[in-house]
């Protein structure tokens, strides 16, 4: 009888345990479902938040040059020379549309374009200015020194006309240039792609800065000259009367004509310097294409290469030579004007250096101008001759071909390099090689010795003469 109460108590305890466990399980399931629901809601909230942020980020306007590709150079001449031509367009030269485009196919020329109209308007203005200068010179005693305004303005007018004709050919020239570049061995690094464009930009920047400095010094010297030879009480009017004397030689003073003369002088000075820079820039581009081919030949120097390799490189070399001929035909007149112009002005400046300088400002301007002129002429000669130097450098690598790899293609390639005279020319009268530097120097010395025999010490600030004569 005592066993039954004990058994009953045990059954009660067991029933409580079973009941309590099932309750806990139900509670656990409820809690688990609540946790899952809360987790899903938090995930949905987070997902919606991310999507909203993504939509907001995409809705913001993107900058056109924010992409990485916009800052990388493709190594093409078209891209490297784009900004240079853009500056030239501001000064009424090379009126070509699309010079800053990514591909040469963006280039176009039209007579109805505003760039072309501006260029034609400035050509007409330069023609009128040249006519006034010619009239003044012919109505005064003519000397080697007095024809400076005619040489200066005549060369500027000629370069403007040639540049307008070159602008018509430029899209086709750049398309052919792009075709040649595409077939060449590709650049290995971004640095090699960037090098040509960087060199062109630095040459343009340095040339324009020195040209601007020369013009500022010229203005300071002209102000001193105008104050020394004052015709009127107004210093500004006196300055324009002295610096634009070819205009007021045939008409009375006018503020409009004075501003037109100053505008003409500033633009003409830029164009006079730009024609040298343009020859240098084209030379840098052509020389870099030969260098691109030579770098590939240097990488395989002394190795046994298949005949197909030499055949491909020979065709690439021939294409660059054809490109040089096309560019030379297009710019040879500019090259001729550049060298003849520099030769004349160096002779004139050296002859004037024998005279006594009337002021410190004039002396600073004169010697800065002379050094800049000689340096610019030397730079044009050396950069232009680099085309010939790079074309001949190919022969050095061909002579290192092993005996086992010697084949008719290598022999043919070598004969082409030896027999061809690859260089820019001045209308086919002379080739721009390193020998030309010595020839020009010898010519200047010869002319200078002859001119010294007839030289007379003159007053550089003769108020009866033009400031620029």
Curated annotation (Swiss-Prot):
Ranges per topology, Cytoplasmic: 1-117, 168-199, 287-330, 375-435
Major place of residence:
membrane
Residue ranges annotated as transmembrane are: 118-138, 147-167, 200-220, 266-286, 331-351, 354-374, 436-456
Protein name, entry field: Gustatory receptor for sugar taste 64f
For the keyword Kinase, the answer is no
PANTHER family assigned: GUSTATORY RECEPTOR (PTHR21421), GUSTATORY RECEPTOR 5A FOR TREHALOSE-RELATED (PTHR21421:SF29)
The compartments listed are: Cell membrane
What is the stated purpose of this protein?
One of the few identified sugar gustatory receptors identified so far and which promotes the starvation-induced increase of feeding motivation. Required in combination with Gr64a to detect sucrose, maltose, and glucose.
Give the Extracellular membrane side ranges.
Answer: 139-146, 221-265, 352-353, 457-469
Task: Give the originating organism.
Answer: Drosophila melanogaster (Fruit fly)
Q: What tissue expression does the UniProt record report for this protein? A: Expressed in Gr5a-expressing sugar-sensing cells.
Q: Which UniProt keywords apply?
A: Cell membrane, Glycoprotein, Membrane, Receptor, Transducer, Transmembrane, Transmembrane helix
What cellular component GO annotations does this protein have? membrane; plasma membrane
Q: Which GO terms describe its biological process?
A: detection of chemical stimulus involved in sensory perception of taste; monoatomic ion transmembrane transport; sensory perception of sweet taste; sensory perception of taste; signal transduction
Q: Which Pfam families match?
A: Trehalose_recp
Family listed: Belongs to the insect chemoreceptor superfamily. Gustatory receptor (GR) family. Gr5a subfamily.
Q: Which residues are glycosylated?
A: 230
Q: Name one GO molecular function term.
A: sweet taste receptor activity
Give the membrane topology: Multi-pass membrane protein
């Amino acid at each position: 009888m005592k066993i039954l109460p004990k058994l009953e108590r045990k059954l009660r305890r067991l029933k409580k345990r079973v009941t309590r466990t099932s309750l806990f399980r139900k509670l656990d399931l409820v809690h688990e479902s609540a946790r899952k629901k809360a987790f899903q809601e938090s995930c949905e909230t987070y997902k919606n938040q991310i999507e909203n942020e993504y939509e907001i980020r995409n809705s913001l306007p993107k900058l056109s040059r924010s992409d990485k590709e916009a800052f990388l150079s493709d190594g093409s001449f078209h891209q490297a020379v784009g900004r240079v031509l853009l500056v030239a367009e501001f000064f009424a030269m090379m009126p070509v549309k699309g010079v800053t485009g990514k591909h040469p196919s963006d280039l176009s020329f039209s007579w109805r374009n505003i760039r072309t109209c501006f260029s034609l308007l400035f050509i007409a203005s330069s023609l009128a200015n040249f006519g006034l200068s010619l009239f003044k010179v012919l109505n005064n005693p003519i000397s080697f020194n007095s024809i400076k305004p005619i040489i200066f303005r005549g060369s500027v007018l000629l370069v403007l006309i040639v540049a307008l004709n070159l602008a018509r050919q430029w899209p086709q020239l750049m398309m052919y240039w792009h075709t040649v570049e595409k077939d060449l061995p590709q650049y290995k690094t971004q640095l090699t792609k960037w090098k040509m464009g960087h060199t062109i930009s630095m040459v343009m920047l340095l040339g324009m800065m020195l040209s601007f400095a020369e013009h500022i010094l010229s203005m300071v010297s002209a102000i001193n000259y105008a104050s020394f030879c004052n015709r009127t009480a107004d210093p500004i009017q006196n300055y324009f009367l002295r610096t634009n004397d070819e205009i007021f030689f045939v008409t009375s003073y006018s503020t409009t004509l004075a501003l037109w003369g100053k505008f003409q002088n500033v633009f003409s000075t830029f164009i006079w310097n730009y024609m040298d820079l343009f020859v240098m820039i084209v030379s840098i581009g052509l020389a870099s294409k030969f260098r691109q081919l030579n770098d590939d030949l240097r990488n395989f120097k002394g190795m046994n290469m298949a005949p197909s390799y030499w055949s491909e490189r020979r065709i690439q070399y021939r294409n660059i030579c054809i490109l040089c001929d096309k560019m030379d035909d297009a710019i040879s007149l500019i090259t001729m004007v550049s060298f003849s112009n520099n030769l004349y002005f160096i002779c004139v400046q050296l002859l004037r250096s024998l005279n006594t300088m009337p002021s410190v400002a004039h002396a600073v301007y004169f010697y800065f101008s002379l050094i800049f002129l000689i340096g610019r002429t030397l730079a044009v000669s050396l950069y232009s001759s680099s085309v010939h130097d790079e074309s001949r450098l190919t022969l050095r690598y061909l002579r290192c071909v092993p005996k086992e790899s010697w084949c008719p293609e290598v022999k043919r390639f070598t004969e082409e390099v030896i027999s061809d005279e690859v260089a820019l020319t001045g209308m086919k009268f002379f080739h721009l090689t390193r020998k030309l530097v010595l020839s020009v120097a010898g010519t200047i010395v010869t002319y200078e010795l002859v001119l010294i025999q007839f030289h007379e010490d003159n007053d550089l600030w003769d108020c009866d003469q033009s400031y620029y004569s």
